[in-house]
Amino acid sequence: MAITRRSFLKGVATTSAASVIGPSLLASASANAVETTGTWKVSGSHWGAFRAHIYAGKVQEIKPIELDQNPTEMLNGIKGIIYSPSRVRYPMVRLDWLKKHKYSADTRGNNRFVRVTWDEALDLFYRELERVQKEYGPWALHAGQTGWNQTGSFNNCTAHMQRAVGMHGNYITKVGDYSTGAGQTILPYVLGSTEVYAQGTSWSEILENADNIILWANDPVKNLQVGWNCETHESYAYLAQLKEKVAKGEINVISVDPVKNKTQRYLENDHLYVNPMTDVPFMLAIAHVLYTENLYDKKFIETYCLGFEEFINYVQGKTKDKVEKTPEWAAPICGVKADKIREFARMLVKGRTQILMGWCIQRQEHGEQPYWAAAVVAAMIGQIGLPGGGISYGHHYSSIGVPSTGFAGPGGFPRNLDAGMKPKWDNNDFNGYSRTIPVARWIDCLLEPGKEINYNGGKVKLPDFKMMVISGCNPWHHHQDRNRMKQAFQKLQTVVTIDFAWTATCRFSDIVLPACTQWERNDIDVYGSYSSRGLIAMHRLVDPLFQSKPDFQIMKELTERFGRSEEYSRGMSEMDWIRSLYNDCKKSNEGKFEMPEFDEFWEKSVLDFGQGQPWVRHADFRQDPEINPLGTPSGFIEITSRKIGRYGYEHCQEHPMWFEKSERSHGGPGSDKHPFWLQSCHPDKRLHSQMCESEEFRATYAVKGREPVYINPLDAKAKGIKEGDLVRVFNDRGQLLAGAVLTDSYPRGVIRIEEGAWYGPLNEKVGAIDTYGDPNTLTQDIGSSELAQATSANTCIVDFEKFTGKVPPVTSFGGPIEVA
């Protein structure tokens, strides 16, 4: 619909001009307006819903929709994604792979590629699928990598790829994810569900009833800018109310964190420093105080919990380690004075206390333990299931805590084969290997094929796969230890990547296919990941750029090569699918939510169902644990898990325990050589690695063209480093360059480089310096424990120095080196 700029601005006049997460987008976007007429289209993203001004076939301007009262500044980066110099423009094949085929792995990563036609690229892709299934079998193909993808119900790129590849033959896949691998594995044993992705107690209930809120390694102001679906940013209104209550002294908020994070600075609440990776000793000492001073809720423990006696015997030093977990024992480990530990423990039981855990704390060696120990502390407080009390593991994620309307969102494109379908290569012989592996252990498969590892009560035999198909995700961002990955990728015969951006994953691939962005195709999506506020039409803004195509079209053309395209698509077009998903959604919500016919919805673009009713997590369990049991083996909170105990694991035993790390700062193992803890948390200006390629937006935070490294001024002074200097950060695993930002928000001995920075090695050789600042160049690739085998990225210590050599160019961006 073509409209004038004046009528559009009249339509958005109700949008808030202020945001707790940054300056208003309305002010900054209007300054960039270049035309007075044009077409305005609604679309969405992980960063929120917006209207885009289209003129002369290009996106000129982006504004948040009226419903978003707290838009993120990251909407300003969307144009930079669409028009990034790092777009995958054409089908590309790695030069040496094309010349020598699978025998060229030693040059993988040199970024030298040849442009080919779509037919040539898809023929090569299909040929490799055929070869691998014929020569080896399904165990030799890994097509299970996943990530955040882009938003949209129909255009889930992983679903499209896995359905198409699955129609050809079976393959290796994964279980778990990088975000919450340890947490989602341990918590079902303790609280009966993964908890990390569960709707939590409504913010309104917390604000009305809580006396104390503990933000434990939790930074919602930073992390709620993005959502799994199209985000509404409704949580920020509650955070603004919380700020007012903190200022008035109505709620006591304490951030337990090694750093003063963005939320703490916004709320201006108290900060309790804890040494990195030592939260468990702190929690054990809290439990000791609550028990020895008889402050814990004995009735709650007896009514709702099992296994308290075994745990408290450990805390009292009555088990095999013979160490009493007193505040005096914990203080030199965690860096909190014994008297402060006692004061904090006593505060927890004065009034209603809501503990809000973050995810960063479980992405470490023994990452299961802090989540388990925190649940035990919450149980001892005795307020689980009460408004404003208990524990949550998700209030920083995708608007968890905003009441859900109950609207059932649309389904998606089917990932699996339809009933009765069989793949072309109907072979289920995985040669004795496991067909499903823990997500963070896939590099182990390449370096130690055939090795048997423990995992969550079972055994996994690591498959010796030869080929990978990667769609819409960037494992060269989210996995750890880049130089180990380089060694592992030399074992692969073929890597096919389908993406719209030339990431490091493309650099280390053999065949790269150009997908279009989500703004070059149509879709629909839930508006509000957990609030389910409504439904949004995601209109195609511009035609696919260069030779890029929607994933649906790419995979349809692949399946044509073995006669399965009609089965793959069910004979439906993109808009047929979107209409069908909408109509199915309308039917499933009949009698609950009024939805117009599809054409009216598509023109209207946004359906708003308002807000849901407040809710309290675990309230039904507290009301009657026998009628409403938890999903644990006993139905109760399991402080001690006999099931885990029977596994006989060394690093995850039957109740929460303190395990020393393989490396730790502040006096821990290895700190004499590498004394600084590297925190690689979720970024403030990206969604993981998404938007790093957006040049103008990246320039708002990069330092001399590099990723920032945040350093305490005293640590910087000791090394002769000033604001803006280039810094070499290093350990025995790798080295990188980053730009120094000096700030008192970080204590001595702690530095931060946010994850998602694009890896840009100087060359393909093992040990080459990363020119931009990817922290996973330095992190270690070990499992959290035998239970979850999850990522341990935050068990990482480093050293740093001012860089004085010849400054290399950044190699992360701009696409491949095209060879004629």
From Swiss-Prot:
PTM comment: Predicted to be exported by the Tat system. The position of the signal peptide cleavage has not been experimentally proven.
Cofactor(s) listed in the protein's UniProt record: Mo-bis(molybdopterin guanine dinucleotide)
GO process terms (BP): anaerobic respiration
Signal peptide positions (record): 1-33
Catalytic activity: trimethylamine + 2 Fe(III)-[cytochrome c] + H2O = trimethylamine N-oxide + 2 Fe(II)-[cytochrome c] + 3 H(+)
InterPro entries (alphabetical): Asp_de-COase-like_dom_sf (IPR009010), CT_DMSOR/BSOR/TMAOR (IPR041954), Molybdopterin_N (IPR041460), MoPterin_dinucl-bd_dom (IPR006657), Mopterin_OxRdtase (IPR006656), Mopterin_OxRdtase_prok_CS (IPR006655), Prok_Mopterin_Oxidored (IPR050612), TAT_signal (IPR006311)
Tagged with keyword Signal: yes
A GO cellular component entry from the record: outer membrane-bounded periplasmic space
Single Gene Ontology MF annotation: molybdopterin cofactor binding
Cofactor details (free text): Binds 1 molybdenum-bis(molybdopterin guanine dinucleotide) (Mo-bis-MGD) cofactor per subunit.
Top-rank lineage group of the source organism: Bacteria
PANTHER family assigned to the protein according to its UniProt record, in alphabetical order: TRIMETHYLAMINE-N-OXIDE REDUCTASE, TRIMETHYLAMINE-N-OXIDE REDUCTASE 1
Record-stated family: Belongs to the prokaryotic molybdopterin-containing oxidoreductase family.
Protein name: Trimethylamine-N-oxide reductase
Source species: Vibrio vulnificus (strain CMCP6)
Protein encoded by which gene: torA
